[in-house]
């Protein structure tokens, strides 16, 4: 059987489960009203769109999305933008809120518990393979290649991994592997002595939060884990170490299935779990030749498409045209005679005359008043920035009025602006 037909058969035997219930507390006020996977990204998308688009582009069209924390924004996005799959062809995105399966007092207590509470639903669909995905990372990956790697390996679990510098290991689940990619150890966020990639002393394989299981094996693991009172019911802390101890875990390097892939191409994967990382990943897209290609017709990123007019850039009342460089502007934006560089503007942003905006991420429906100066600022949806406001130049004032990171990125929300206006 050739690879195409083999992959097609595997598609039909697999179901993806996207874990999208996390709060993302390190994003601070950006997740006050929405779950992390529902946070805006890249000028027009939501973070979860990348995992879901990978599923569709990989041929995986049976998808469950597990939700919990402040899920209204996420559910509305999925209903408006992802309702085009055809149930009569056994294609679907099934929305799975917390079931309180264990008792009426507990919601999802961990990533493994989130899957366990939907185990009956999974069984009803009868997949041979379950693909467990984190819904809060930015990357493009062909899951069908990983699925084929898993099916051909004979292992019961395959873990997607990305190469990182050893000094970054403290923030990830790190795996040790042998020359055949069998995972021999798995340590969640090691503070020291992280296992390195064979043949290197300064590189590690970090878990991407992507797992493929033989379904029956996964169900057995979850049913055993739920009875363990000492378990935190988490894949990284409990399930994967158990699989490793049973010699059933294979490592799948991201370089094998990243999109695009090939010699000289650096795989792009970002955990946007902090304000700094979120800001940096967004601004990556403003580069002349960004590492993440969102213009790729062969691997599109799908999302909800609001019907809006094109962005418009016009002179101010004095005829000043302004200058726009290395900037992405979504539909419905209007900019009057301002200077904007290396920034992203989501839909329906208004920038009035005389502004200077540099390295900013401006979310939908923001109005920037006249003569504002903004540098290294992330502005949440719906903010009305008063005329003449300066943000990003005075660290003391920024920290007093807004949230400022150690790297100097300033987060501005509607609540912060409203409180500032009341002073």
UniProtKB/Swiss-Prot annotation:
CDD domains per UniProt: ADP_Glucose_PP, LbH_G1P_AT_C
EC number(s) from the headed UniProt entry: 2.7.7.27
Keywords: ATP-binding, Carbohydrate metabolism, Glycogen biosynthesis, Glycogen metabolism, Nucleotide-binding, Nucleotidyltransferase, Transferase
A GO biological process held by the record: glycogen biosynthetic process
Gene Ontology molecular function: any one: glucose-1-phosphate adenylyltransferase activity
InterPro entries: ADP-Glc_PPase (IPR011831), ADP_Glu_pyroP_CS (IPR005836), GlgC_bac (IPR023049), GlmU/GlgC-like_hexapep (IPR056818), NTP_transferase_dom (IPR005835), Nucleotide-diphossugar_trans (IPR029044), Trimer_LpxA-like_sf (IPR011004)
Reaction equation(s) it catalyzes: alpha-D-glucose 1-phosphate + ATP + H(+) = ADP-alpha-D-glucose + diphosphate
UniProt cross-references to SUPFAM superfamilies, sorted A to Z: Nucleotide-diphospho-sugar transferases, Trimeric LpxA-like enzymes
Protein's UniProt keywords contain Nucleotidyltransferase: yes
Pathway(s) per entry: Glycan biosynthesis; glycogen biosynthesis
Pfam family for this entry, one: Hexapep_GlmU
Keyword Transferase appears in the UniProt entry: yes
Residues given in the record as alpha-D-glucose 1-phosphate binding sites: 108, 173, 188-189, 207
Gene3D superfamilies registered for this protein in UniProt: Hexapeptide repeat proteins, Spore Coat Polysaccharide Biosynthesis Protein SpsA, Chain A
Subunit structure: Homotetramer.
HAMAP family: GlgC
Family recorded in the similarity comment: Belongs to the bacterial/plant glucose-1-phosphate adenylyltransferase family.
PANTHER family, per the entry: GLUCOSE-1-PHOSPHATE ADENYLYLTRANSFERASE (PTHR43523:SF2), GLUCOSE-1-PHOSPHATE ADENYLYLTRANSFERASE-RELATED (PTHR43523)
Function: Involved in the biosynthesis of ADP-glucose, a building block required for the elongation reactions to produce glycogen. Catalyzes the reaction between ATP and alpha-D-glucose 1-phosphate (G1P) to produce pyrophosphate and ADP-Glc.
Name the UniProt record assigns to this protein: Glucose-1-phosphate adenylyltransferase
Species in which this protein is naturally found: Francisella tularensis subsp. holarctica (strain LVS)
């Amino acid at each position: 059987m050739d690879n195409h037909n083999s992959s097609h058969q595997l598609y039909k035997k697999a179901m993806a489960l996207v874990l999208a219930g996390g709060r993302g507390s390190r994003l601070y006020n950006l997740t006050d009203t929405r779950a992390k996977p529902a946070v805006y990204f890249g000028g027009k998308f939501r973070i979860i769109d990348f995992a879901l688009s990978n599923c569709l582009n990989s041929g995986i069209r049976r998808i469950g999305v597990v939700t919990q924390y402040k899920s209204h924004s996420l559910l509305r996005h999925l209903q408006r933008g992802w309702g085009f799959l055809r149930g009569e062809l056994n294609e679907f995105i099934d929305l799975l809120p917390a079931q309180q399966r264990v008792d009426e007092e507990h919601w999802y207590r961990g990533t493994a518990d989130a899957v366990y509470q939907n185990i009956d639903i999974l069984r009803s669909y009868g997949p041979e393979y379950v693909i467990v995905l984190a819904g809060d990372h930015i990357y493009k990956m062909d899951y069908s290649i990983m699925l084929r790697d898993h099916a051909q390996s004979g292992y019961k679990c395959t873990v997607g991994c990305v190469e990182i510098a050893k000094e970054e290991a403290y923030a990830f689940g790190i795996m040790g592997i042998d020359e055949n990619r069998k995972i021999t150890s798995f340590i969640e966020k090691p503070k020291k002595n992280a296992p390195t990639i064979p043949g290197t002393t300064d590189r590690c394989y970090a878990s991407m939060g992507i797992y493929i299981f033989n379904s029956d094996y996964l169900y057995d693991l979850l049913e055993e884990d739920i009875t363990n009172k000492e378990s935190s019911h988490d894949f990284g802390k409990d399930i994967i170490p158990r699989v490793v101890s049973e010699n059933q875990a294979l490592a799948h390097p991201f370089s094998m299935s990243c999109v695009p892939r090939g010699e000289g191409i650096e795989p792009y994967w970002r955990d946007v779990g902090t304000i700094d990382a979120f800001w940096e990943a967004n601004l990556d897209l403003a580069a002349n030749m960004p590492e993440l290609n969102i213009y790729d017709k062969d691997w599109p990123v799908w999302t909800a498409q609001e019907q809006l007019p094109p962005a418009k850039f016009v002179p101010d009342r004095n005829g000043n045209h302004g200058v726009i460089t290395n900037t992405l502007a979504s539909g419905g934006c209007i900019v009057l005679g301002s200077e904007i560089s290396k920034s992203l503007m989501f839909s329906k942003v208004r920038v009035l005359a005389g502004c200077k905006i540099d390295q900013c991420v401006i979310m939908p429906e923001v109005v920037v008043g006249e003569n504002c100066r903004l540098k290294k600022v992330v502005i949440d949806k719906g903010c009305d920035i008063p005329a003449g406001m300066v943000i990003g130049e005075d660290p003391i004032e920024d920290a007093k009025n807004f949230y400022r990171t150690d790297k100097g990125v300033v987060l501005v929300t509607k609540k912060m602006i409203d409180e500032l206006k009341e002073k």
